[in-house]
Amino acid sequence: MSLISADNIVKIYQSHSLVGASARKTVLHDISISIGQGETVALLGRSGCGKSTLARLLVGLERPTSGEVRFRGVPLTKLDRSGMKAFRREVQLIFQDSPGAVNARSSVRAIIGEPLRHLTSLDETRREERIQELLRLVELPPEIADRLPAQVSGGQLQRICIARALAVNPKLIILDEAVSNLDIHLQASALALLTKLQQEGGIAYLFVTHDLRLVQKFAARCLVMDEGQIVEEIKTADLDSMRHPASRLLREAVLPPLPVRAVETN
């Protein structure tokens, strides 16, 4: 059974003008995907093709117009309160815009501790122990817990967001362009960390990106998305054999390779 799946997902947005006219825009067309335990799947596509919309649907931030998102075979719409709490624990999302994903007035301790407060029954002492454990896991010093987001670097803040996502031991993390804003060395370091965590804990990833170079380093299977549709599915080892025009355009836009040493040693 898949950990999470989307079955025939359609998403339509309707907008209204000041004079009362309305317009409908279909951004996802009959999307079906599945992700298994411990699997890394890339969702590859240019900006604006619907990747982030699909990511929001998969974590329950939006509802599809038609079709179903299923968690361990059960539609999200059929989950009771305890089932939805389990879903929130097991499926986490890391956004591209890490500064926008955190409260600028909250300390790093409060940011990482947020899911622990809402999704676990840990007391304050155990929460603090878990926060310090997570900081060590993402290779950040303990004193950073007292800082505000503006007092840490971009790479550190992204690691803080990773620590927050890991706080409740998820089974799946959706990375929505989560390393795209980092420089090439920080990208390599972040991917090495995520790979290490997967090897140690069996976490599954949906890696949402427009960068084929990152897919080659991180994913085993690749879904190519264009204009709201999955147009190609291929193993990462076979990326040179991509056939769809949208896939070929992405292949031709590959950036310089990640630094090998950073990937191997971080």
Curated annotation (Swiss-Prot):
Q: Which reaction does it catalyse?
A: Ni(2+)(out) + ATP + H2O = Ni(2+)(in) + ADP + phosphate + H(+)
Q: Name one Pfam family in it.
A: ABC_tran
The protein's induction, as recorded, is: Induced by low oxygen tension and metal ion deficiency. Repressed by NiCl(2) excess.
The reply to whether Oxidoreductase figures as a keyword in the UniProt entry is no
Q: What is its main location?
A: membrane
What CDD domains does the database record attribute to this sequence?
ABC_NikE_OppD_transporters (cd03257)
* Molecular function GO labels: ABC-type nickel transporter activity; ATP binding; ATP hydrolysis activity; nickel cation binding
Its domain of life reads Bacteria
Give compartment(s): Cell inner membrane
Top-tier EC class: translocase
Give the matching InterPro entries.
Answer: AAA+_ATPase (IPR003593), ABC_transp_ATP-bind (IPR050319), ABC_transporter-like_ATP-bd (IPR003439), ABC_transporter-like_CS (IPR017871), Nickel_NikE (IPR014137), P-loop_NTPase (IPR027417)
Query: What are the GO cellular component annotations?
Result: plasma membrane
Query: Membrane topology type, per the record?
Result: Peripheral membrane protein
Task: Give every ABC transporter domain span.
Answer: 4-252
Give the UniProt keywords, A-Z. ATP-binding, Cell inner membrane, Cell membrane, Ion transport, Membrane, Nickel, Nickel transport, Nucleotide-binding, Translocase, Transport
Where is ATP bound in this sequence?
A: G45, R46, S47, G48, C49, G50, K51, S52
- What does the record give as EC number? 7.2.2.11
Q: Which family does it belong to?
A: Belongs to the ABC transporter superfamily. Nickel importer (TC 3.A.1.5.3) family.
Describe its function: Part of the ABC transporter complex NikABCDE involved in nickel import. Responsible for energy coupling to the transport system.
Complex formation:
The complex is composed of two ATP-binding proteins (NikD and NikE), two transmembrane proteins (NikB and NikC) and a solute-binding protein (NikA).
The protein's name in its UniProt record: Nickel import ATP-binding protein NikE
Q: Which organism is it from?
A: Brucella suis biovar 1 (strain 1330)
> What lineage, starting at the top, does this entry show?
Bacteria, Pseudomonadati, Pseudomonadota, Alphaproteobacteria, Hyphomicrobiales
